[in-house]
């Protein structure tokens, strides 16, 4: 499509107004909603990812204090989530959360569940500090099918499905080096209209080394 209009890919990639991501597809809930997690997530499929298990948490309306408490309970550390526009450098917990997002996205696609409402890491129960039930999908699945599964079991199933499409993509792409030939981010994520530095409050600008580190951690 880009060749047809005579516009170089770099021109699309460097201009945020195009909403272009990579491999011919647009962005979908990237750094403007979840920092590094949103950026790596958008590279994991061959189109804009219909994934909302991250943004339904960061855009839930909960104060950051409550979100960080839920993050500590669910993923092991408060740093797994940041306030939008007040991002901190990447770490293992952010990428651990990304793995759950990918697993649940595939799971919801297979089970026909709405990926905006689920998963249920949080809930309206103030007495429980808004901590939800990450095993809710497993409870529904077990009740309907009679096959007992835990949330971890279903996450493994989701990752298996995701890895299958990644392997298929490698075959169709003719390359096993997905980091070089597929998992590409656009140049505009490294810019800011006011030239604010990454990790400055008020900007969603990313840092190239930090994004590369995010990929490294995720694929470990």
Regions picked out by a protein language model, each given a short descriptive name:
Residues 1-220:
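Extended C-terminal regions of large enzymes
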